[in-house]
Amino acid sequence: SLIDQTDKDFIWMIVDDGSDDGTRDTVQGWIAENRIRITYHTKENGGKHTAYNLAVDNCATDYMFVALDSDDFMPRDAVSEINGLLRSNPGCCGIVGLAVCDNGRKPDDIEKFNMRSMYDVLSTYDFSAETGLVIRTEYLKKFKYPVIEGEKFFTEAYTYYQMTEPFIWTNKVFRTSTYCSDGLTKNIYRLYAANPKSFYMYQKMRSEITVNFKKKLKSVISADAFYIMSGQSEKKSALARLFMPLGFLYYKYIMHKNRT
């Protein structure tokens, strides 16, 4: 789908996160064809967030967009739409477009959030739309993911919650997935158990910056659970200490779900 883009003004950056299936030879063949610009980077497997950090460090364009998995594709006019919006809004922090599943499901309306920040939308609403993001590279470099030894997952929301600059929000589709599942939801308790430190960092951060009291309270309780799970010893806030009993119950629930 990248070769078929109507606007070829982009670079396809491939981050090979430890594959052993001949990916290098395949990519070198694509580069030799010279149909679109491609850069290729390799690293040891460390989780998607570490591959994203490497991509940000090596991005040679003013804006970085749209992260694609191997089973995703972009509509033929996606790059043209993105570049048109960037030309019409010079200096903008970024664009939030839609990512949809190729199953006919009607996508969400996100244009109503136009010129609001990621933090504003995520901390105020029960936002669940899948998105394709275009973000200014220099801005992205402020929000790289922490790397925790022994853990290979860090929720993308950790960086989005910290982005307080206004974004352009559009209902244009930037990414489509041909294989859609709720695998992340199904395996969420395994992720919790395997990555407690990263989830603790995320929920603690969210509890500190979220204004919405309901969301703040949920994050405090979640942070308490991951505090226990990850063996943290740092001093806790008065609010976190107050809700530790509920955090303990949530911790027990997570461990129970992880065993079933």
Language-model-derived ranges and their functions:
Residues 1, 16-25, 46:
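A conserved acidic beta->alpha catalytic loop
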Residues 62-73:
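Short beta-strand-to-loop acidic/aromatic patch adjacent to the donor-nucleotide binding site
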Residues 10-18, 39-43, 68:
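Short beta-strand/loop segment that forms part of the nucleotide-sugar
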Residues 108-189:
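Conserved nucleotide-sugar donor-binding catalytic segment
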Residues 43-59:
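Glycine-rich, basic loop-to-helix element that forms the pyrophosphate-binding segment
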Residues 1-9:
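Short, acidic, metal-binding catalytic loop of nucleotide-sugar glycosyltransferases
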